Design a protein with these regions (language model features):
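Cytosol-/stroma-facing membrane-proximal "stalk/adaptor" domains immediately downstream
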Residues: 143-165
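Hydrophobic alpha-helical transmembrane segments
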Residues: 34-48
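N-terminal membrane-targeting/pre-transmembrane regions
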Residues: 1-36, 141, 148-150
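Alpha-helical transmembrane segments of multipass membrane proteins
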Residues: 30, 52-53
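A short, polar/proline- and glycine-enriched secondary-structure boundary/capping micro-motif
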Residues: 17, 81-85, 162-165
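Non-transmembrane, membrane-adjacent beta-strand/coil modules in membrane-associated proteins
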Residues: 2-3, 73-148
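Short aromatic/basic micro-patch
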Residues: 64, 80, 153-155
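Transmembrane-cytosolic junction motif
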Residues: 53-77
């Protein structure tokens, strides 16, 4: 059995700036709304707090690899991808400029969620599930061996798939 390898997700500069700015704006808005008082102000402040808190549970924390499967860990759960069902492809970085967010974050706590984008220079839209916090480095695209499965983008060490132990 191969040893388990771990990769702690790094944040790129845009993710750090975006997350910090959004949290500052939400904090100021929540304080202002609660100081105003009134039911609608408190409801709006609560919705803003939920907007700030829920992504903490959706962003990936780390990725592990045991030679047979990739495990993406989140705060309260994990997703397991068997490499018998996917082919890993290392990509230099992925661009979100021509991508459409279906239910996704474009930098707030990373680039997680469901995206529609052109992959590998193909001239058709692909749907992919992204669990990344950096789009500049260590991006792995899991291409399904069966058409019925979705494509997955995550951060992991590209050397895991190019060297033999």
């Amino acid at each position: 059995m191969k040893p388990i390898k771990h990769y702690k997700n790094k944040w790129d500069r845009f993710t750090i700036i975006m997350t910090t700015l959004v949290l500052i704006v939400i904090t100021i808005a929540v304080i202002a709304l609660y100081c105003e008082g009134g039911l609608w102000h408190q409801v709006t402040a609560t919705v803003l707090l939920l907007f700030a808190i829920i992504p903490i549970f959706l962003r990936p924390l780390s990725t592990s690899y045991d030679g047979e499967k990739l495990i993406v860990r989140f705060l309260c759960y994990k997703k397991v991808y068997s490499l018998s069902q996917y082919t890993p492809v290392y990509i230099e970085h992925f661009s979100t400029t021509k991508a459409v967010r279906i239910f996704a974050s474009g930098g707030y706590f990373g680039y997680w969620g469901i995206w529609r984008m052109h992959l590998n220079g193909r001239d058709r839209w692909d749907t992919l599930h992204s669990y990344t916090t950096s789009r500049k480095e260590d991006c792995i695209l899991l291409m399904p061996k069966e058409e019925s499965k979705h494509k997955v983008l995550l951060n992991a060490d590209g050397r895991w798939f190019t060297t033999t132990d």
